[in-house]
Amino acid sequence: MAIGLARMFGIVLPLNFYSPYKAASITEFWRRWHITLSHFLRDYVYISLGGNRRGKTRRFANLITTMLLGGLWHGAGWNFIIWGGLHGLYLILHQMWQALLSRLSLNTSGSAYSALAWLVTMLYVVVG
């Protein structure tokens, strides 16, 4: 509705959601969900903290910090902060999983793996 109203006044708004429920990983979900906020947090928090340039431990700490602040942005209650921390943890677990799959040279292109990956992602999003 906002996009249509803005276009009536000649304003083109940036894409903010890109089918996030089709994502087959939590990382992909966050690339598709609330894109403008995600880009802001990436550019002004994650990268300012050092991003992924200072080793794995620092990268994980930067992810958690960024997601905690994203949770705080959604609301100033502990439930929002915990939610942000959980999603930071999910992103870390996904990065660790990807590294393990890469080390083991496992093929993840099959439809069964894709379906399971989507299901796990939706459980993270809906339950956590």
Give names to the regions the model predicted.
Residues M1-G128:
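Membrane-embedded transmembrane alpha-helical bundles that form the catalytic cores
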